[in-house]
């Protein structure tokens, strides 16, 4: 995923080391799927474990009626070796605009440093 230009506008090279901040910046500033996947898997260990953590986070934000299939929001089949087994290849995350707003509000209120990242006008990903 991280080296496929279809999914990652900030390619990650196998064998290279990246800081968490580099991955977070590329994830939050330019929506780099490879960085998102790397962070989620490093934190949770698997797509299924990440989904459980994301559902718990959403619940804290007051959101309970959503479906999370992966950390990126792509169809399940696009995740290659990280796709969920036994789940349709076309399954995608399902949440409303209100759900996204509630999760975003919770994120900013509880992790205000998020704004320091998202207010950057540019970042170097070399």
Q: Where do the PLM segments sit?
A:
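Short, glycine/proline-biased beta-turn/loop segments that scaffold the active-site neighborhood
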Residues: 1-13, 118-126
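Penicillin-recognizing serine hydrolase domain
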Residues: 20-26, 41-126
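Conserved catalytic neighborhood of penicillin-recognizing serine enzymes
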Residues: 4-40
């Amino acid at each position: 995923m991280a080296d496929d230009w279809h999914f990652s506008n900030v390619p990650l090279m196998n064998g290279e080391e990246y800081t968490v901040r580099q991955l977070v910046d590329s994830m939050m500033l330019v929506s780099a799927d490879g960085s998102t996947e790397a962070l989620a898997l490093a934190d949770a260990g698997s797509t299924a474990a990440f989904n459980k953590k994301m559902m718990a986070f959403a619940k804290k934000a007051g959101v309970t009626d959503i479906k999370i299939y992966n950390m990126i929001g792509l169809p399940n089949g696009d995740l290659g070796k990280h796709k969920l087994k036994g789940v349709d290849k076309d399954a995608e995350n399902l949440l409303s605009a209100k759900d996204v707003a509630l999760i975003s509000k919770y994120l900013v209120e509880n992790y205000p440093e998020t704004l320091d990242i998202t207010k950057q006008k540019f970042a170097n990903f070399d």
